[in-house]
């Protein structure tokens, strides 16, 4: 009878340990999934921002250097700046601050880009700041 009791106790201990390990595994898997999903969202938003920044920079250069108001349309620039600013919310607070600075500079300088090298340089400088911030966040992902 004593041997049966020992087997029952051993069985109960094994069941409890299996349950604990099962719950811990589930918790870890859930945490890992959420973390990976968050990193993926940041990565996708970052790549989209980098593409939009390159497109905005091309827009600025077409407007200033090529005097091409079709490729350098300020309306297209406004759309790109707005999209960059919206996507920066998904990346990092530092990138949101940089994109806000880009939007502020664009608001101030967009009408002078066609004629002023200083305005062009100011906008391009802010574009570079947002790029640097975005690259920094991408490097930190694991």
Please annotate each region the language model reported.
Residues 12-29:
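Hydrophobic membrane-insertion alpha-helices, especially the h-region
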Residues 1-16:
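N-terminal positive-inside, membrane-proximal cytosolic segments immediately preceding the first
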Residues 27-142:
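Conserved non-transmembrane functional hotspots
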């Amino acid at each position: 009878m004593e041997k049966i009791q020992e087997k029952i106790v051993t069985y109960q201990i094994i069941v409890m340990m299996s349950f604990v390990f099962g719950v811990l595994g589930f918790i870890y898997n859930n945490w890992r999934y959420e973390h990976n999903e968050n990193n993926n969202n940041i990565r996708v938003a970052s790549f989209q921002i980098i593409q939009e920044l390159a497109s905005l920079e091309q827009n600025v250069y077409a407007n200033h250097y090529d005097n091409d108001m079709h490729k350098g349309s300020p309306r297209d620039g406004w759309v790109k700046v707005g999209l960059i600013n919206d996507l920066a919310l998904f990346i990092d607070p530092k990138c949101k601050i940089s994109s806000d600075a880009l939007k502020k500079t664009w608001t101030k300088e967009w009408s002078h880009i066609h004629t002023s090298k200083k305005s062009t340089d100011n906008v391009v400088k802010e574009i570079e700041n947002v790029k640097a911030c975005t690259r920094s966040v991408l490097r930190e992902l694991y």
